[in-house]
Amino acid sequence: MLDVIKAIEAEQIRTDLPAFKVGDTVKVHVKIKEGTRERIQVFEGTVIKRQNGGLRETFTVRRLAYGVGVERTFPVNAPTVSKIEIVRKGKVRRAKLFYLRDRVGKAAKVKERRY
């Protein structure tokens, strides 16, 4: 039974998305349906957490919009996420960056990872 579930999940997992980590700044292209029209909206921010794994994996992106912190959680394998672009790679020592919620301005910056 478990093998059947794993097989179904394996065929539905997306492989076209880049590998990104917590701390990276990403642009998430999301399909939004308004009535009969469908458009793509871009949400750019820092990945502050990744949760679960496999087909149920989600990630949360945080950004400041007009001085107000906005967080959105996206399923990694959802068809509404059309594309994920990595803007810059961040260097962090935590799996969850909730401390960024209390910081404003330059204090909320994440160091860049160099390769």
From Swiss-Prot:
Query: What's any one GO cellular component for it?
Result: cytosolic large ribosomal subunit
Q: Name one GO biological process term.
A: translation
Keyword Ribosomal protein belongs to the record: yes
Q: Keywords in alphabetical order, please.
A: Ribonucleoprotein, Ribosomal protein
What is any Pfam family matched here?
Ribosomal_L19
- Identify the domain of life: Bacteria
Cite the GO molecular-function annotations of the record. Answer: structural constituent of ribosome
Q: InterPro entries, alphabetically?
A: Ribosomal_bL19 (IPR001857), Ribosomal_bL19_CS (IPR018257), Ribosomal_bL19_sf (IPR038657), Translation_prot_SH3-like_sf (IPR008991)
Task: Reply yes or no: does the keyword Ribosomal protein apply.
Answer: yes
What does the UniProt function comment say about this protein? This protein is located at the 30S-50S ribosomal subunit interface and may play a role in the structure and function of the aminoacyl-tRNA binding site.
Family named by the database record: Belongs to the bacterial ribosomal protein bL19 family.
Report the protein name in the record: Large ribosomal subunit protein bL19
Q: Which organism is it from?
A: Clostridium tetani (strain Massachusetts / E88)
